[in-house]
Design a protein with these regions (language model features):
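Conserved catalytic core of the tyrosine transesterase superfamily
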Residues: 1-195
């Protein structure tokens, strides 16, 4: 398990601590921000010639990332990074069906992390005077409606509930089907919430 408090350079660690303690983001969200920004800074160091051109991205340290590097980033740098993500980044490198290019939603999440980092540096930490990511657009995402079960599919699903926790599982599925709950909402549900 990663611990950004030990691995992140100070400028990045301060941002991540802010998100976890002040913004109240979950540890998992903050860890994902760290991974996204670590990869971005690795790419920047490679792209700006701060490491040898043939250095594998995963072997580039970000310990020396500081305000000079962060402050030199332009929209063009981020567009180059997005191009790398969409064409060259290996998806699931240890998988037998590894392919190149991240999906638009995956790239959009990375854009959100970069945008949030620069917003923090500008508005909260006041380390840079102008936010270079203010005009950064997210990749276009196709809007799709959720797929719903029809009545017969819902009945069939409920009829196939069995096992040691049949009553509990039936109740959970009934809540999902009738209330449209998300998994996080269901997990956070307490007996006292039900009237």
């Amino acid at each position: 398990m990663i611990d950004y408090r030990l691995e992140a350079p100070p400028i990045l660690r301060d941002f991540l601590v802010y998100h976890e303690t002040i913004q109240g983001h979950s540890r998992r969200t903050v860890d994902e921000y760290f991974l996204d920004l670590r990869n971005f800074f690795r790419f920047l160091k490679l792209d700006k010639g701060r490491v040898a051109r043939n250095t594998p991205l995963g072997q580039i340290s970000i310990d020396d990332v500081d305000l000079d590097l962060v402050g030199s980033v332009t929209l063009s740098d981020v567009y180059a990074y997005m191009n790398y993500l969409s064409r060259d980044r290996v998806v699931h490198p240890n998988s037998p069906d590894a392919r190149n290019g991240l999906s638009a939603p995956a790239r959009a999440r990375k854009v959100a992390a970069i945008r949030s980092f620069y917003k923090y540096l500008t508005n909260k930490a006041k380390l840079i005077s102008e936010n270079p990511m203010q005009d950064l657009d997210s990749p276009h995402l196709k809007k799709s409606l959720p797929r719903y079960l029809d009545l017969e599919e819902s009945v069939s699903l409920l009829e196939h509930v069995d096992g040691a926790n049949q009553a509990r599982d039936y109740c959970i599925l009934t809540l999902f089907l009738n209330c449209g709950l998300r998994i996080s909402e269901l997990v956070g549900l307490n007996v006292t919430d039900v009237r």
